[in-house]
Curated annotation (Swiss-Prot):
One of its GO terms (molecular function) is rRNA binding. It holds the Pfam family Ribosomal_L22. InterPro entries: Ribosomal_uL22, Ribosomal_uL22_bac/chlpt-type, Ribosomal_uL22_bac/org-type, Ribosomal_uL22_sf. Belongs to the universal ribosomal protein uL22 family. One of its GO terms (cellular component) is cytosolic large ribosomal subunit. It comes from the Bacteria. GO terms for biological process: translation. This is Large ribosomal subunit protein uL22.
Amino acid sequence: MSQFNAYHKNARISAQKVRLVADLVRGMFADEALDTLKYQPQRGARMLEKVIKSAVGNAQDPDQNSGRSHRIEELVITDVRVDGGPMFKRIQPRARGMAFMIKKRSSHIRVGLTHIENV
């Protein structure tokens, strides 16, 4: 069984928001997952959809996997990881000379596909 990965590093969305969508597609076939994400209203669904398409493209590239091209119907999402990335820290001035910290969070999205034969 072959493993194909795709990454989106430093995605400008918090990991918590993407994990909600990632839990929906974990364990699905790649074509079903893309159909599911197409109708999700969350912004994280668009980002995850692009990463899955990239992983499918890696699986269909014959140069990367010794001359074989895998069909999208035979690919299963076995690994979806959404980890926290670096934070941009900003200062927001408040009353009486105080300042509040604003944390603009980012995330690293990783998708792993596995080829299943005879589906």
